[in-house]
């Protein structure tokens, strides 16, 4: 039996989660059932303290602290968690940190990954912060061009117009968004592309991702969960009527979805790279025969897969975490 672990959960406010769908909640319940101790904090309460660090062998070490609470969780609507008193703890004293806050993948997010690196390798961070920083979901996928639909990432309006002229029906996405926010389908006869681009670039200095629209999305956008590079389950997310986006955040309907031969081919192609980078918990998105995104920040879908297939992937995730912590401890 694995020893009891001290587990810090870096996430958004726990009082706002949907306990019937939140994957972080499923991970916390599973950790608690194994006898691990949970501690909750938000990114905004982290502090990297220079000059107050302990001295070991004459070498000054920066220490990463956070203000947070010990927490117990229970599957009970309206009262799903119980906090201990607010306290400050040294995150370097934790066995595991689950990095589970949602994007946007902005400079605040990137800064948090840099701060977390100060407690490695003594603390296992899931997913590895440097790997997450180097693998934004909509960019990591471009390292597998043979698996993805025609795609353009650019600031150049003329390049976007040329891409549309070639492929006619396109999807326009903010590069660092999540949950389907800001995603538009521009049909061949749509006259709003110029206005959309003007609005985006007036507000943001970030490039856009443009992809060929895949009609197969009407049959669903499949989310496949990989644990340490191995596919363990999937759900299909079907767009609502009149909606181009299939994300569950915007009304996509989850349904059972077995893994196909093409799904397994995609997973076999990307799995070793994910494992080598320390990306233990990953969710990929597949439309038809194409890989469209690789989600490494805070993947979701665990509870939906459990409901449809009876497969509790959170157990496999904790099996792998415990295996990886053992040599550290």
Mark where each language-model region is.
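Hydrophobic beta-strand scaffold residues
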Residues: 38, 125, 170-171, 281
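Short glycine-rich anion-binding loops that position phosphate/pyrophosphate groups of nucleotides
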Residues: 13, 101-104, 175-177, 299
């Amino acid at each position: 039996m694995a020893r009891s672990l001290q587990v810090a959960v870096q996430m958004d406010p726990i009082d706002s989660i949907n306990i019937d769908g939140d994957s972080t909640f499923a991970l916390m319940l599973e950790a608690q059932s194994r006898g691990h101790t949970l501690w909750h904090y938000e990114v905004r309460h982290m502090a990297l303290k220079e000059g107050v660090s302990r001295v070991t062998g004459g070498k000054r070490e920066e220490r990463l602290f956070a203000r947070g609470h010990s927490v117990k969780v229970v599957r009970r609507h309206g009262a799903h968690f119980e906090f201990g008193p607010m306290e400050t703890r040294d995150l370097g004293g934790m066995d595991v940190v689950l990095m589970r806050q949602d994007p946007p993948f902005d400079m605040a997010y990137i800064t948090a990954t840099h701060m977390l690196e100060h407690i490695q390798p003594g603390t296992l961070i899931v997913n590895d912060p440097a790997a997450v920083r180097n693998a934004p979901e909509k960019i990591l996928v471009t390292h597998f061009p043979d698996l993805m639909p025609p795609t353009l990432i650019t600031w150049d309006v003329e390049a976007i117009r040329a891409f549309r002229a070639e492929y006619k029906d396109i999807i326009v996405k903010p590069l660092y968004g999540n949950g389907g926010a800001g995603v538009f389908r521009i049909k061949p006869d749509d006259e709003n592309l110029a206005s959309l681009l003007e609005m985006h670039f007036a507000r943001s200095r970030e490039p856009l991702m443009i992809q060929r629209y895949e009609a197969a999305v009407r049959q669903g956008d499949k989310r496949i969960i990989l644990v340490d590079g191995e596919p363990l389950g999937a759900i299909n997310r079907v767009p609502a009527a009149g909606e181009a986006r299939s994300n569950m955040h915007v009304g996509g309907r989850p349904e059972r979805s077995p893994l196909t031969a093409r799904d397994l081919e995609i997973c076999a192609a990307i799995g070793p790279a994910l494992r080598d980078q320390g990306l233990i918990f990953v969710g990929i998105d597949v439309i038809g025969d194409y890989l469209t995104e690789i989600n490494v920040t805070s993947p979701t879908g665990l509870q939906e897969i459990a409901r449809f297939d009876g497969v509790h992937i959170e157990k496999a995730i904790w099996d792998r975490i415990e295996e990886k912590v053992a040599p550290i401890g």
